[in-house]
């Protein structure tokens, strides 16, 4: 690659500032057919999960990169309104209450988010 296109960092998902504060961003899976990753943000903190609702094993969103987030605390599944906490992915209301999203380990370095798996 040339100097204008630096080699990408392994595991790079997105920049923290790509995610609306209090919102979510979808990162496509590297492998075709695999679920993507949803990254949620509150201020300088972020958490990542597989974009799969534990209720019916379907994506949390209807449309690409369109998520319902409330008060920078909860992420809602667009299909059956299950509500998941940002910080641990735990469903606190809805048809899969008590279940949790599958966490993706991440790290934040200089406002960039990397997959830590």
Give the ranges of each region predicted by the language model.
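Short cysteine clusters
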Residues: 53, 77-80
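Glycine-rich phosphate/adenylate-binding loop and adjacent beta-alpha elements
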Residues: 95
């Amino acid at each position: 690659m040339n100097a204008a296109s630096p080699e990408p960092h392994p595991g790079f998902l997105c920049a923290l500032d790509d995610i609306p504060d209090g919102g979510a961003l979808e990162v496509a899976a590297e492998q075709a057919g695999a679920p993507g990753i949803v990254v949620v943000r509150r201020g300088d903190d972020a958490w990542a999960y597989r974009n799969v609702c534990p209720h019916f094993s379907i994506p949390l969103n209807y449309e690409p990169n369109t998520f319902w987030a409330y008060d920078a605390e909860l992420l809602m599944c667009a299909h059956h309104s299950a509500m998941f906490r940002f910080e641990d992915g735990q469903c606190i209301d809805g048809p899969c209450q008590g279940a949790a999203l599958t966490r993706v380990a991440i790290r934040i370095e200089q406002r960039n988010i990397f997959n830590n798996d």
